[in-house]
Each structure stands twice: as structure tokens, then as C-alpha cells.
């Protein structure tokens, strides 16, 4: 089973702590939306929450039937995967984007969390 590659900064993005100026007009509102969703789903902003997300993403990158879109950009290949995330406080549909690395592993780039308010 291949492990999903998730850069540590992506956990900041998921838990409302993204910073910086790169794409700030998009990333800052999105990181706040992600934080609200993580809270609604009952995912703690700690190592246990990171493990929950890592385990979910490890499972989905090993399931070929959940790929809903693929594309190439600047000699890199990407895909969107659809999944149902079950948190301690509820469920949400994840549309996660992945860069396909040369060895076939997947590197997490972003996610759109759908469902709930």
C-alpha cells in the first residue's frame, strides 16, 4: 500500500493556519472554510487529527475507482479523487487534488470539502 505524501504545511491549510502572500486572496478564505469544516467534522487540530486525515488519504490514493479527473500541467500529472470522509462528528465529501510523482506515489496539493455548513 502506497502512502499519501502530505507536506506539513498542508495540515496548517486544513486547520485554518495558512499564511503567506502566495495566492493569499484565495488561500486565506479557503483555509478558514477548511477550519470550520474540520471543527464540524470533529477532527482535532493535533497529531490525532493529522493521523485521521493521513489514514483517510492513504486509503484513497490506493483506490483507483475514485479518480474523477486527470490532467497534465508543465510536465507534471495531476488527478482529482472523490471520497467520503468520516470524522468523529460527521461526514463530508472530499474532492482532493494530487500530483502523481515519478515513482507513482501521490502528493497532496489541495482539497475541497463539501457538505455541512
Residue locations for each model-derived region?
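Compact soluble domain cores
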Residues: 1-83
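Basic/aromatic recognition patch in beta-strand/loop cores that engages polyanionic ligands
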Residues: 74-100
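A short, surface-exposed interaction/processing loop segment used at functional sites
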Residues: 90, 99-117
Amino acid at each position: 500500500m502506497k502512502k499519501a505524501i502530505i507536506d506539513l504545511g498542508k495540515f496548517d491549510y486544513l486547520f485554518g493556519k495558512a499564511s503567506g502572500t502566495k495566492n493569499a486572496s484565495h488561500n486565506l478564505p479557503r483555509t478558514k472554510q477548511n477550519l470550520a469544516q474540520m471543527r464540524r467534522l470533529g477532527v482535532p487540530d493535533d497529531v490525532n487529527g493529522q493521523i485521521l486525515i493521513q489514514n483517510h488519504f492513504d486509503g484513497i490514493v490506493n483506490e483507483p475507482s475514485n479518480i474523477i479527473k486527470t490532467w497534465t500541467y508543465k510536465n507534471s500529472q495531476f488527478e482529482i479523487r472523490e471520497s467520503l470522509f468520516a470524522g468523529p462528528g460527521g461526514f463530508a465529501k472530499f474532492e482532493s487534488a494530487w500530483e502523481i510523482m515519478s515513482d507513482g506515489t501521490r502528493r497532496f496539493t489541495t482539497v475541497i470539502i463539501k457538505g455541512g455548513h
